[in-house]
């Protein structure tokens, strides 16, 4: 089993040293702004993790909790203010947003240099040309996990369930660059009842859909690497998208939920903030 907390602690310690060196060099702390709409259990967990890690790293963390009265024009104006605010190094927009908001339109108003989630069209487009600028923290976390498990990617059958711009799409491009054969599954795969078929042949399986135990343990190929990105609240329990107890009997490596991908994702977000801060101050410290 992969201990995400342990990996995250090691990475965070290294980041703390880098942020400290930058503070000594520049005399200012990195600062990030986070927008959150409505109450969402997964978002709340992530926000608490961000805030805690920011405190540990010496990063200034500003949270904007938006209510239903906050309209799109108001949020766009806030984005404009932050884009021109030289004190802000990174911006995060937590999803889900209000139904009335056009998320893509909102993204286009964000300064790509301050997009530390790697979701601005420019940053996503850079992945196609293998220019790794700001990468989705979740996709980066998955790659960090896989790099610790995989000796040779070439020719591996990779199956990714979920084609979001946060996980599935960027991860597919990153893994294709490793010369793997990537299958990207989505709701259409389930509609034609072919999900199990694809899962059964996966050497590497990544699941990120937000559906409790969607993937059954008995589907897992013997010796496969399983990365479960999902986080779902079922009663008083937090579970992933994979039927963990059965899957771990077949997988060579598997991430638990919680304490798997999540802690590393938060560190990767801060790594993107560090890179944005370095770029703004034109330093290699």
Briefly describe each language-model feature range:
Residues 96, 208-211, 230-231:
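Short glycine-/small-residue-rich Rossmann-like dinucleotide-binding loops
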Residues 54-68, 182-185:
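Short beta-strand elements in bilobed, periplasmic/extracellular small-molecule ligand-binding domains
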Residues 39-51, 133-225, 237-245:
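Glycine-rich phosphate/diphosphate-binding loop of Rossmann-like nucleotide-binding domains
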Residues 92-153, 171:
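Anion-binding alpha/beta catalytic cores of soluble intermediary-metabolism enzymes, centered on
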Residues 1-27:
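Positively charged, low-complexity intrinsically disordered leader regions
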Residues 74-86:
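Short, well-structured alpha-helical segments in soluble
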Residues 104-124, 230-281:
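Rossmann-fold NAD(P)-binding glycine/threonine-rich loop
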Residues 29-39:
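Short beta-strand segments enriched in small/hydrophobic residues
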């Amino acid at each position: 089993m992969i201990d995400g907390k342990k990996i995250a602690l090691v990475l965070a310690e290294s980041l703390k040293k880098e942020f400290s060196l930058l503070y000594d060099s520049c005399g200012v702390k990195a600062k990030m702004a986070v927008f959150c709409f409505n109450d969402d259990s997964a978002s709340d967990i992530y926000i608490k993790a961000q805030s805690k890690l920011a405190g540990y790293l010496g990063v200034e963390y500003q949270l904007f909790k938006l209510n239903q009265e906050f309209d799109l024009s108001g949020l766009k104006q806030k984005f404009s203010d932050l884009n021109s605010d030289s004190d802000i190094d990174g911006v995060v927009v937590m999803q889900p947003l209000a139904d009335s908001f056009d998320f893509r339109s909102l993204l286009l108003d964000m300064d790509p240099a301050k997009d530390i989630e790697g979701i601005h069209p420019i940053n996503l487009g850079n992945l196609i040309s293998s220019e790794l600028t700001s990468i989705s923290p979740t996709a980066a976390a998955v790659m960090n996990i896989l790099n610790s498990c995989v000796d040779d990617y070439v020719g591996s059958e990779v199956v990714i369930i979920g084609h979001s711009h946060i996980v599935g799409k960027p991860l597919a491009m990153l893994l294709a660059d490793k010369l793997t054969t990537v299958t990207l599954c989505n709701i259409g795969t389930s509609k034609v009842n072919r999900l199990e078929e694809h899962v059964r042949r996966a050497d590497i399986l990544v699941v990120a859909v937000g559906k409790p135990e969607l993937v059954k343990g008995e589907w897992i190929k013997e010796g496969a690497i399983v990365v479960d990105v999902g986080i779902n609240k079922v009663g008083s329990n937090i579970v992933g998208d994979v039927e963990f107890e059965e899957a771990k009997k077949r997988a060579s490596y598997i991430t638990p939920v919680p304490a798997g991908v999540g802690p590393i994702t938060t560190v990767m977000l801060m790594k993107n903030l560090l890179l944005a801060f370095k770029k703004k101050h034109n330093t290699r410290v």
